[in-house]
Amino acid sequence: MKRLGHVPIHKGDFHLLPPKVQRFVAEKAELMRPRGIYICDGSQHEADEIIDKLIERGMLSPLKAYENNYICRTDPKDVARVESKTWMVTPDKYQTVCHTPDGIEPIMGHWMSPDSLATELDSRFPGCMAGRIMYVIPFSMGPVGGPLSKIGVQLTDSNYVVLSMRIMTRVGHEVWDALGDNDFVRCIHSVGLPRPVKQRVINHWPCNPERVLIAHRPAEREIWSFGSGYGGNSLLGKKMLALRIASNIAKDEGWMAEHMLIMGVTRPDGKEHFIAAAFPSACGKTNLAMLEPALPGWKVRCVGDDIAWMKFGEDGRLYAINPEYGFFGVAPGTSKKTNPMAVATFQKNSIFTNVGETANGEYFWEGLEDEIKDKNVDMINWLGEKWRIGDPGLCAHPNSRFAAPASQCPIIHPEWESPKGVPIDAIIFGGRRPAGVPLVFETRSWLHGIFTGACLKSEATAAAEHKGKTVMHDPMAMRPFMGYNFGHYLQHWIDLNKDGRKVPKIYHVNWFRRDANNKFLWPGYGQNIRVIDWIVRRLDGEPDIGVDTPIGIVPKKGAINASGLPDIQWDELMSVPKEYWTNDAKEIRKFLEEQVGPDLPKEIRAEMDAQEERINKQA
């Protein structure tokens, strides 16, 4: 067997790797001291081999009702992204965070000094892979070799990560060819539990929750993740590379890396528009990306459901690619009623984490009660306990996930892997706003749209560790994923609007407004096509369908196609209540002054002043 120093190479030819990758692998093998090295090739044979090993070990079990679907339960302490332990590391603190006043904790960006990082890494990574295999995963974000694509190499000691990365990114030999001796994003991941293990491993899921650390070094294009196997912390191509590191690269190179879905919407007359939309986690990005239109003649096709990399083309239009290869979706609430296309996507070749399992070998989670054939079937919940519908507690963890290949989505767009991307006509921001915010409004300009995105708020969700129903700020839906100083990020958006460029129109939507009895005012889901229809008509210049308000243009009464809808309280749904917005404006000013302070671009401050003035003048 070939060796690298003392370490046997179980698979792959080390000497065929690009020289920079060889140095990276050798250096980290010396640091983490695995018992062997395994260079992944992304083949089906490799996946089958790893799946068999994990089934034998008890970490995965097949869901017998489907073809090649597997379920896995994690340690109950390792179930979500850990924002409090996720850091950006820059020599100057203010490259990462804004200049906030004394006593105000920045909510965007979480800074650590390079010296502190060195200490933290030194206390974790030496010898951390003892007794485990180090897998080397070459992966491409975006089509291999595409002009907008980026290559990463992830080292990990988790086979769950190897299996998930081949669904979520493009893994394979061709990545090495595309890389050559160019630079790549260095991704180092360990579950942080060297063998012999001194503590009890729960659910055959090694992790080290007390010692979790996720650190990004943007200047070095490097990511370190320790102690967690959960996807949001361990699949380093996802939020870490595709948003936190990519937003830094994008700032340097003049493009955008955003937390947005990309959808193609075709009108009944055959004209297609592409829309990117930013919603905080668990506000329905995946549902909108795979919308099943309730209006006849409309067609929606999905390019991506979570991340958009966008760059202006030679023709002045903004082109977007989905850098991912799969969907990593929240399972609870996903059903044939709420998202039939997602359900169709994960009928095979998918991995389910922390969901329930029925005695018939099917998955189960909250939201599937009406769709399950046998309501009395015995189940095992996400904690591995016996469970039945009607029992107390939840069957699936609220942040349980499916990982499914995007190519299996029945409405995946034929251009979803186009290397140059699709041209974006509109950007939508949205969040869960129970009060005060109309169903949809169009912003006044690119700058007013940036201001509106900076003010994005939403009720907190399961994807992060926050609890309770508080409405939280989530600017541009990027709060947990900001890769650098948010004031500089806003300035970057402003600077992108150069002469000769056609910037998209920017909209804000709110599917979640409630009436006095706490009932939703809007039916949502497939009916959201009616809002998209209004947006598209605005894009196409249809006259007389909008009304000016202090916050932007809302649909004129009767402008939204209501055929076949039950009674909707249109006035309440579209209203812009003066008292609400007067208070909101004060709250937004306080937020931007405290959180962005002197880093707030003057153009955005001017937008804030102008909007306050419009609200105060409102009758």
Curated annotation (Swiss-Prot):
Q: Which residues bind substrate?
A: 81, 230-232, 281, 399-401
Task: List UniProt keywords, sorted A-Z.
Answer: Decarboxylase, GTP-binding, Lyase, Manganese, Metal-binding, Nucleotide-binding
Q: Which PROSITE patterns match?
A: PEPCK_GTP (PS00505)
Query: Could you name the active-site residues?
Result: 283
Q: Which reaction does it catalyse?
A: oxaloacetate + GTP = phosphoenolpyruvate + GDP + CO2
Instruction: Name the Gene Ontology molecular function terms of this record.
Output: GTP binding; manganese ion binding; phosphoenolpyruvate carboxykinase (GTP) activity
The record's Gene Ontology cellular component field reads: cytosol
| Annotated Gene3D superfamilies | 3.90.228.20, Phosphoenolpyruvate Carboxykinase, domain 1, Phosphoenolpyruvate Carboxykinase, domain 2
The UniProt similarity line reads: Belongs to the phosphoenolpyruvate carboxykinase [GTP] family.
Main function: In parasitic nematodes PEPCK carboxylates phosphoenolpyruvate to oxaloacetate thus introducing the products of glycolysis to mitochondrial metabolism. Catalyzes the conversion of oxaloacetate (OAA) to phosphoenolpyruvate (PEP), the rate-limiting step in the metabolic pathway that produces glucose from lactate and other precursors derived from the citric acid cycle.
User: Subunit structure, per the record?
Assistant: Monomer.
Q: What is this protein called?
A: Phosphoenolpyruvate carboxykinase [GTP]
Q: Which organism is it from?
A: Haemonchus contortus (Barber pole worm)
UniProt lineage: Eukaryota, Metazoa, Ecdysozoa, Nematoda, Chromadorea
Question: Gene encoding this polypeptide?
Answer: PEPCK
